Amino acid sequence: MEGPGLGSQCRNHSHGPHPPGFGRYGICAHENKELANAREALPLIEDSSNCDIVKATQYGIFERCKELVEAGYDVRQPDKENVSLLHWAAINNRLDLVKFYISKGAVVDQLGGDLNSTPLHWAIRQGHLPMVILLLQHGADPTLIDGEGFSSIHLAVLFQHMPIIAYLISKGQSVNMTDVNGQTPLMLSAHKVIGPEPTGFLLKFNPSLNVVDKIHQNTPLHWAVAAGNVNAVDKLLEAGSSLDIQNVKGETPLDMALQNKNQLIIHMLKTEAKMRANQKFRLWRWLQKCELFLLLMLSVITMWAIGYILDFNSDSWLLKGCLLVTLFFLTSLFPRFLVGYKNLVYLPTAFLLSSVFWIFMTWFILFFPDLAGAPFYFSFIFSIVAFLYFFYKTWATDPGFTKASEEEKKVNIITLAETGSLDFRTFCTSCLIRKPLRSLHCHVCNCCVARYDQHCLWTGRCIGFGNHHYYIFFLFFLSMVCGWIIYGSFIYLSSHCATTFKEDGLWTYLNQIVACSPWVLYILMLATFHFSWSTFLLLNQLFQIAFLGLTSHERISLQKQSKHMKQTLSLRKTPYNLGFMQNLADFFQCGCFGLVKPCVVDWTSQYTMVFHPAREKVLRSV
């Protein structure tokens, strides 16, 4: 009795102690609690010698089932509920019994239950991926529909079993397959499953966004709007769903949203329509291409304007404060209207580069005359050139993004599924790839990064296997530049500003400095700020690399895990810590006069344990 969902069927048939999955459409929290209570109430079978074959199948009593079949029981014979033994074995994930029944002549696609479902349908409803794989290997047809008109992939979508969705599509089932009503899996997901998944997951397989169903002629976006599924609407708009297609009633998605009076969806659709309309203008397209450059120019001008206001020849700090507030208000309008949301993450990067630009200009115009003959001159020039070089290398170098073709993704999914490894530890549901050791999916870059350290706020790029060593030098030379500017600022202030610190104290001294050169004090504050965070990050990175052999992500993850463990977890005792010299040699890939040799590991394609010849250690993922 499948009823409206598998939960009622499970209760009515009392099919033994298997954990129930989601109810129909994945919205069944209350029913799951009832099933859990019912399962706890099931009596344990102490004497299996007298139980019938249905109950023996439900409980996975292989010897009793084998005894009854060899005694003449027909494995094709359904019970009084029109459910076959293969159905009961499939829903309870009894792999050995399924193999046995098929070897004895069971029909792998036998229909049964109130909804005329196959054993494959039952296994999918409960999310039993190993059972799905086994049935498909024995010839189960995933294109068959049940009594509700759903095929295998539709059921997997409705019950939100992403590994099964990935496996079915990788085995060749079309992501655009329609049910009896002409609805694709994407339509069902957008309409029936409230939330970002599995809509976002399906979109990674490039489904048709603008196909319409048979009855209502709705697109997936129509269905998402009809259900008020804000997350699905957002995903579909991001993927490029059409806003102009009309359904059988002549309604666009916006018309439906206006009828439903869903203000958030109305705002989303109108905003998207406005953005797409702007794409038709050549000037708008040019502005989009130049967003990063314009953001950098805005930052440079804003920082100059702040310094100019502070250095303005006026004793009224109230006037200067009002001018600063006005400046911040005006500059905040530019990113809001002309810079896309994705490029706003580069605002700290623009701030850093603008700071360095005005630091250099201040040194060249104000500090150079006093320090031209000192070693400071060459050191500063070298430091700022090196900083710009390593910033560029950190920004431009591939940090270790893992890439795979469509065919490689499908082969990986099938391989992982059939080896029992298709889970979140080894498979990235965003990139649809097998995750290398020490990798992590960056949600800003939307890609898995090999030997992931962090997504750097100041460079706007991920730090990983490919650019981590450049990042270290970037921090080092930024600290050098700021350190020299701090030194130069004090030299300039001491030689150009008359102060009476010994006579009048600190407060008077500060007032004299502010009155003497607000611009230099402003640059000094910027340099001190950048020196503080860059030096802290540099020391932290060197400690992690040399003494722990860990990345920032690994260190934070281990510290979080340690809080939930009874015994304190030592960060030094990890498989990656090979000692001070070996850690540095491996990280920078350089030896030390033959005393230490680096171990070359390509972390973009390292999926298994690594044997390290230097220390005879086995490296594992943390």
Swiss-Prot record:
It is an enzyme of class 2 (transferase). Its main location: Golgi. Pfam families: Ank_2, DHHC. One of its GO terms (cellular component) is Golgi membrane. Its EC number is 2.3.1.225. It comes from the Eukaryota. It catalyses: L-cysteinyl-[protein] + hexadecanoyl-CoA = S-hexadecanoyl-L-cysteinyl-[protein] + CoA. It is a multi-pass membrane protein. The chain crosses the membrane at residues 292-312, 321-341, 348-368, 371-391, 471-491, 519-539. Residues 1-291, 342-347, 392-470, 540-622 are cytoplasmic. ANK repeats lie at residues 43-78, 81-110, 115-144, 148-177, 181-211, 216-245, 249-277. The keyword Protein transport does not apply. Residues 313-320, 369-370, 492-518 are lumenal. Coiled coil: none annotated. Residues 426-476 form the DHHC domain. Interacts (via ANK repeats) with CLIP3. Interacts (via ANK repeats) with DNAJC5 (via C-terminus). Interacts (via ANK repeats) with HTT. Interacts (via ANK repeats) with MAP6. Interacts (via ANK repeats) with SNAP23. Interacts (via ANK repeats) with SNAP25. May interact (via ANK repeats) with SPRED2. The DHHC domain is required for palmitoyltransferase activity. This is Palmitoyltransferase ZDHHC13. The gene is ZDHHC13.
